[in-house]
Amino acid sequence: MAILVEVSLWVLITITTIVSWQGFRNPAYFDKYLFEVEKITIDKQYYRLLSAGFLHTSWLHLIFNMVALYIFSVGVGHILGIVNFFTVYLGSMLIGNLLALYIHRRHEDYSAVGASGAVSGVIFSSICFMPQAEISFYFIPYTIPAWAFGLFFVLVSIYGIKKQADNIGHEAHLGGALAGIVISIFLSPHILKLNYFPILLMSVPAITFLLLIAYYPSMLLLPNHWYLTTKTAKETLKTNYDDLDDETALNELLEKVSAVGYYNLSKQEKKKLEELAKKIES
């Protein structure tokens, strides 16, 4: 069983790395599979709810998620078995992205990538089974109980969703974490009896918050500083690239990618960038 868990985990990490690398080198591929509200709700491209979990914005983003996945997955894999482990992983990825879709359903330009929701689910599954395990950080000379880390994680995610002051996918984190708890209880009901207090301590704030935003959506109608900043940057850097020669247009587009990120380009800009890339390749 131990060898099977290790092999399966490394296969998952390898697939995620290959898909992410393909996204790094091919903007069209990245754009085709990332999580984008408009593509999912209007164009019905539901596969993006899962495919986005295998893409990342950078090598650092990828490495951070895969290291966290490896650290917490071995224990969960041994306890639940391979099939149930992947149920937690993919289920958390899907539910995390569904929560992000619900919260950002009015933001058609919102997009995201990353395995963070799935990894959060695995982390919280691990905490459900081993709430008293000690978690340490390289930059802090102390350890904290896993359940305390889980509670802190939930509260930070709730604050991040409410504040909307950065480009971190707090919605996917919270949705994935809660999914990891629920799926683990479904697969192993006895853990609720054994570890009911830490599980409730992590779950109640998350469930309460989700119920509040379901019944009072106006709670989320605060200025989205990241969205406004990105929108302003887009408008400021807007250029008619058809009026420029290819070299100048390419330089302008690459400069904009550096400033606001590829997934914040308009559809026309992405199309123009792909056209210029094909010209260079030919």
Roles of regions detected by a PLM:
Residues T229-S282:
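C-terminal regulatory/interaction regions
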Residues M1-L244:
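A detector for small-residue-rich transmembrane helices and their helix-helix packing motifs
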